[in-house]
Amino acid sequence: MKYSQNKSLNTFEIEYKIANKSVKIKSSGKMGVITKELKLKEPAIQSNNIYYLKNHGDSRIIIGTMKQQIQGVLAGFCIELKLVGLGFVVHKVGNTLVLDVGYSHYRSCLIPKEVVVKLEGSQIILYSINKEKVTTFASLLKTFKKINMYKGTGILGINEKIKLKKGKVR
């Protein structure tokens, strides 16, 4: 099955194939192409060229995945992280992100092919058309320096608010 929308700015196309216990969804647009295969909990039932799904959760997963893919191929997903702390620095060396976040050694990780990284001072801007890849990479970076609830330092999302705990009263 194929669905497409053509306007001057937004152009996208969705193709999907329903097999017995899986659905393959392919979305393409101006930003790129995303392909994903979903496993169904119950087999799909076909009657007069109409597919029925027994499990309500399966249909919600398919609709949610299509929404994410449409948004990804039209605009993409952007996540901004900030390094809060004295002397916290981030560098991009080739295809590797190197973080100096207060340990005796540097923390480094490979940047996935689908994710574009831009550094502005102490901010890390991650961009991709695949929401799953960019959020997974952002959560990986956040694990390198967890938030200190007493000082408010660590790797934070740009809109993340922290309620500081009280220290010891002497």
UniProtKB/Swiss-Prot annotation:
It is found in: Mitochondrion. GO terms for biological process: translation. InterPro entries: Ribosomal_uL6-like, Ribosomal_uL6-like_a/b-dom_sf, Ribosomal_uL6_a/b-dom, Ribosomal_uL6_bac-type. Its main location: mitochondrion. Keywords: Mitochondrion, Ribonucleoprotein, Ribosomal protein. Transmembrane segments: none annotated. GO terms for molecular function: rRNA binding; structural constituent of ribosome. PANTHER family: 60S/50S RIBOSOMAL PROTEIN L6/L9 (PTHR11655), LARGE RIBOSOMAL SUBUNIT PROTEIN UL6M (PTHR11655:SF14). Belongs to the universal ribosomal protein uL6 family. This is Large ribosomal subunit protein uL6m. It comes from Dictyostelium discoideum. The gene is mrpl6.
